[in-house]
Design a protein with these regions (language model features):
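Conserved, structured core segments of small domains
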Residues: 1-106
Length: 106
């Protein structure tokens, strides 16, 4: 019997803060966020992720979408809190929406 806990998949939508400096905070920490995302992807935690945009024309980043494999919603919250975007104050953690998620098999 395996000691590894079952993992579940979650879809996360999280908005950035909306103050005047929010986008500059996001951009200043972006490389650290991407490095952490790469590490989490290699570890099998992050399935997919990307920026939410205000529009396709303007392409201003206003938040993030993530598909995360974790043991629980609580673990997802812990992962979000430790992300460079959250630590630097780019993400507004109060807006995080976490949904149980199943990918279509087609």
């Amino acid at each position: 019997m395996s000691a590894t806990p079952a993992k579940y998949t979650f879809l996360v939508l999280i908005d950035d803060h909306t103050d005047a400096d929010a986008l500059s905070r996001r951009m200043s920490i972006r490389q650290a966020h991407l490095a952490e995302a790469t590490r989490r992807r290699q570890a099998g935690i992050l399935v997919s992720g990307g920026a939410l945009l205000d529009s396709h024309e303007r392409r201003t980043m206003v938040g993030s979408s993530l598909i995360i494999r974790a043991e629980s919603e609580q673990q997802v919250l812990e992962l979000l809190r430790a992300d460079p975007y959250a630590v630097a104050g780019a993400w507004n953690l109060d807006t995080a929406r976490i949904y149980p998620y199943v990918e279509a098999d087609f």
